[in-house]
């Protein structure tokens, strides 16, 4: 589906921006509700990663936890769907419960070398890593290129917005997740999925 700005929608529909904002907010709330229902992953090959959204990187601060940014955790089933959520931080204590709640034991998980992923094997997963800090981005089938493709897509979308409050950020994030997951659907199917799927 097309991804118009509010100004473009206003020009097409002749509605004022306040009305458009109200309608879009209702749609995003519905999308967020549906996204939670779709977010359970079956067994398979899953890529997991984190990314940071928001303020520009502060000089002198590098890596995970860069000041002023919002941490987002993501899981992508290869040849399937993505799930993303805002997290307080990217520690093992925060990420492991999400992983265990979304991915069945016995699945194969691909990650980078972040220490929060230590212990996945002990929790019943097959775990393969690539070490970006050693300029390793793929080893055979082991890589996180799929989830990184989603991060690139999401950040291109967010570059259009001039700052978002925390509650609006989450809704836009789930909209981005939904658009990615249904990117091959035609518009009619997309609208039907949002508004006519039973709770």
Range-by-range predicted roles:
Residues 1-199:
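Residue-level recognition of single "structural anchor" positions
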């Amino acid at each position: 589906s097309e991804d118009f700005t509010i100004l473009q929608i206003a020009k097409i529909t002749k509605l004022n921006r306040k009305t458009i904002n109200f309608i879009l907010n209702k749609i995003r709330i519905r999308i967020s509700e549906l996204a939670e229902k779709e977010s359970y992953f079956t067994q398979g090959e899953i890529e997991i990663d984190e990314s940071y959204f928001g303020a520009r990187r502060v000089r002198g601060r590098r890596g995970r936890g860069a000041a002023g940014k919002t941490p987002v955790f993501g899981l992508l089933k290869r040849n399937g769907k993505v799930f993303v959520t805002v997290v307080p931080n990217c520690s093992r204590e925060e990420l492991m419960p999400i992983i265990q709640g979304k991915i069945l034991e016995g699945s194969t998980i691909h990650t980078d070398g972040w220490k929060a992923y230590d212990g996945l094997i002990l929790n019943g997963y097959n775990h393969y890593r690539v070490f970006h800090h050693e300029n390793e981005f793929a080893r055979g089938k082991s890589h996180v290129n799929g989830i990184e493709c989603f991060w690139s897509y999401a950040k291109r979308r967010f570059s259009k917005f001039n700052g978002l409050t925390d509650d609006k950020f989450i809704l836009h994030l789930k909209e981005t997740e939904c658009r990615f997951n249904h990117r091959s659907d035609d518009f009619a199917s997309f609208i039907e999925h949002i508004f006519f799927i039973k709770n």
